[in-house]
Every structure is written in structure tokens, then in C-alpha cells.
């Protein structure tokens, strides 16, 4: 019994030592930008990181990931922890249903699917797949970011995010035929979709990025 206790103590010590090793953080460059608000100077050293298309920001993110995964990969119980979490998460999940037009919609995940699927059914018929985000891209990095139905539920506008980006694309389809309606809207960011009756909807978008420069101007549009 004492040997077992000593062995457990040794394992705990080794885990503690391995997880408390000094981390050599990548130093973030300071590029001061001064703004004046009501006579007060406000210094921002990291404004340059807001340019998410610049090579400098890309390099910064790369080095941050290097540091992070170097630490995570040396945790001895990481694989066991992942295995346990996957086991706990592997169960069917169904959201509360909601009514749009004649159909009842709900999201369902069979267990370990990357994204929940949007289903619908009519009366007591067998549910059918309406939107399956898992088929948006081969590598599974394109996600469903939002869904908004027109007032009569004849159309639905849904937004997608590629690679976890804040930028969105908005796609409109006919709910009965599932055929595309109009053009895909690009450069949507931090925006909800608000329908104006069944004529169209309002949304906010940024100007298309030019080179590595992003515009902070937000335009309001209505799509017909």
C-alpha cells in the first residue's frame, strides 16, 4: 500500500513539474498610436493587431499557436482527458422546436457531429434535413452562423462562417424548393438579419477589404 502511495505521489510530482515549466512567451511588438478624446491622449500599443489581413498579424498568430501547443502537447494526461470528454459528449442532442410557416424546425446532433443539423417536419411526417452545415465544406471548417426566416417563412437567409472568421456570407433559399434566391452577400460582419415583411432584409456590412486594409465604415442595405 505504501509503495502504491509513493508511486502516486511520484506521478503527481512529475505531472506538476512538467506543467509548471517556464513558458517562453513570444514578445509582442508595441507600435504606439495616440488618439485624443476630449483633450485626453489615449495610447494604444497594439492597434496594429486589428489588421487581420496583414502578414505581421498572421505571423503573430502563428507564434502564439506555437507557444500554446508546445505547452498543451507536453501534458501527460491530455489524451485521456480528451477521451473522457468525448465519451461524456457522445449522446443525442435535440433543441426545442420552433414553428415557421407550416413546418416545425429543430436542431439535432447525433452525438459527436461537428455541427448540429437543422431538421423540419410537416404535421406528423418523418423529419427531413433542411440545412446540414457538416456538408458546407470537405474539411468541416465552414459553420452555420445564423438563420432568419421571412415573415411568411417562404424564404430563409442563413449566414456561414469560413474557418472561424468573423466575416460572414449570407445565402437566401426558397424554403419549399431549397433553391438559391438572388446573389450571395459577402463581407457581412457582426450583423443580424432583420426581414422587412417578405420584401427583403436589413443587414450591416463592411466595405470589401482592399489589400491589407480594412474599412471601419458600416453600410446599411436592404436586399430585394
For each of these PLM feature ranges, what is it?
Residues 1-23:
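Bacterial Sec-dependent N-terminal signal peptides
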Residues 19-224:
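Beta-propeller folds
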Amino acid at each position: 500500500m505504501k509503495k502504491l502511495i509513493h508511486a502516486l505521489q511520484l506521478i503527481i510530482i512529475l505531472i506538476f513539474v512538467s506543467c509548471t515549466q517556464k513558458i517562453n512567451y513570444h514578445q509582442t511588438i508595441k507600435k504606439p498610436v495616440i488618439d485624443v478624446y476630449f483633450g485626453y491622449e489615449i495610447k494604444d500599443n497594439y492597434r496594429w493587431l486589428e489588421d487581420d489581413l496583414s502578414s505581421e498579424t498572421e505571423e503573430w498568430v502563428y507564434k502564439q499557436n506555437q507557444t500554446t501547443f508546445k505547452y498543451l502537447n507536453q501534458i501527460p494526461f491530455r489524451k485521456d482527458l480528451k477521451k473522457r470528454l468525448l465519451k461524456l459528449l457522445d449522446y443525442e442532442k435535440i433543441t426545442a422546436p420552433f414553428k415557421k410557416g407550416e413546418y416545425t424546425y429543430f436542431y439535432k446532433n447525433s452525438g459527436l457531429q461537428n455541427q448540429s443539423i437543422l431538421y423540419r417536419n410537416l404535421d406528423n411526417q418523418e423529419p427531413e434535413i433542411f440545412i446540414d452545415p457538416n456538408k458546407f465544406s470537405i474539411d468541416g471548417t465552414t459553420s452555420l452562423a445564423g438563420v432568419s426566416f421571412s415573415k411568411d417563412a417562404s424564404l430563409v437567409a442563413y449566414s456561414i462562417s469560413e474557418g472561424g472568421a468573423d466575416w460572414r456570407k449570407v445565402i437566401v433559399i426558397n424554403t419549399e424548393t431549397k433553391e438559391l434566391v438572388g446573389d450571395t452577400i459577402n463581407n457581412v460582419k457582426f450583423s443580424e438579419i432583420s426581414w422587412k415583411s417578405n420584401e427583403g432584409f436589413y443587414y450591416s456590412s463592411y466595405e470589401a477589404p482592399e489589400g491589407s486594409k480594412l474599412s471601419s465604415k458600416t453600410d446599411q442595405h436592404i436586399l430585394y
